[in-house]
Amino acid sequence: LIVLEGAIELEITREKLPLIVKGFLAALIILIGNIYVLQFLFKALFGMEGAPAVLFAIPLAIISSAVAIPSASSLLQLEREFVVYESTFSDILGIMIFNYALRQLESQQPLLGAEPMVSLGLQIIGVIVISLLITYVLFRMMQQIDHKVKFFLILALLILVYAFGKVLHLPALVTIFIFGIFLSNVKSLLPPFLRKTLDLEATEKELHEFHILTAESTFLVRTFFFLFFGFSIQLSDFTSTSPVLYGLLIFLAMFALRYVYFTATSLKLKPSPLVYMSPRGLISILLFLQLNEVAFINLEESPVDERLLLIVILSSMLVMLLGTMKKDQKKEIEIQDEEAPLSVEMDIEPQSLTEKDNKNL
């Protein structure tokens, strides 16, 4: 649901292609950079290395689009669109890298290598073709089904496709992602010979309703997971200051890397508001809790636990809040300057007026 909602949010046009590429590169480079930095920190602080360090680093490195996109409403239009693309790509790439790393490590295969990378590339190409066909079939279903209840049926079919992908060891999330991309950009991405057989104008309203249903379902899932995560945290667990200090150090390292990236790409030392837009959230929690099922990881004895994750999440959200507040204050000052009335003060002394001027007055 989270990947599907993020993909539906992406509007792909020729005019926005440079911005999309920038958002994708920022998400990929910062994500990979954070994983390497966190691996180094985990080894230096906790003596952790190898597979556990990689799997613990990935959830902490992912930006939460669920938090970043609504928080970017006060930014300029280009900055807001960049946040949408970067955070969505960070979510999707992070989940894909996590599942890929988990599959490789559980099968005791190397993370990087020619064979696994070629295999992954071929799988993604196959998934794109499958997603194209699924999009066409679901559009036909939207037009053929007259019953009121049809959107949950479509979601059920997508869940079925995801389950088949997991069973066949395919990147199933890529299927959902590509489907969402095709769904929201069907007029520009669907081949002409398939578009001719579909009444796209008639399905626009239904697509909008499907988007709303997906967004509300995702919001419900997010809410419950945040509640469950909150229930799992006990204040008595924070008797030691070590998790707080380690969490702050990890967040500052990731924030410094983000600052360096945006400084290098914009050639400006003054931090952009985009630097602050890197909150952690639901995806980090979900992937972190998934580590409970990994055989070679023991979360109860690990120094990287829920307390450290909570500190990183709260720190990232607090920095984002301060960054957006600073942006709002600048905007308010600029608006006040623009709306200030133009006034000209003239000092005229009555004594300087001549008799002729007095008569005219």
Predicted regions and their residues:
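Membrane-interface junctions of multi-pass transporters
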Residues: 1-22, 142-146, 158, 162-246, ...
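Structural signature of hydrophobic alpha-helical transmembrane segments
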Residues: 1-3, 49-64, 119-130, 171-184, ...
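Alpha-helical transmembrane bundle and helix-membrane interface signal
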Residues: 12-16, 69-128, 141-148, 189-195
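Transmembrane alpha-helices that form the ion-translocation and gating core
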Residues: 16-76, 136-137, 235-334
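Cytoplasmic-side transmembrane-helix entry/capping segments in multi-pass membrane proteins
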Residues: 17-32, 78-89, 146-157, 215-221, ...
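Hydrophobic alpha-helical transmembrane segments in multi-pass integral membrane proteins
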Residues: 35-41, 91-106, 160-174, 222-235, ...
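Hydrophobic transmembrane alpha-helical segments of multi-pass transport and channel proteins
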Residues: 92, 124-133, 160-170, 186, ...
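Intrinsically disordered, low-complexity non-transmembrane regions of multi-pass membrane transporters
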Residues: 187-216, 329-361
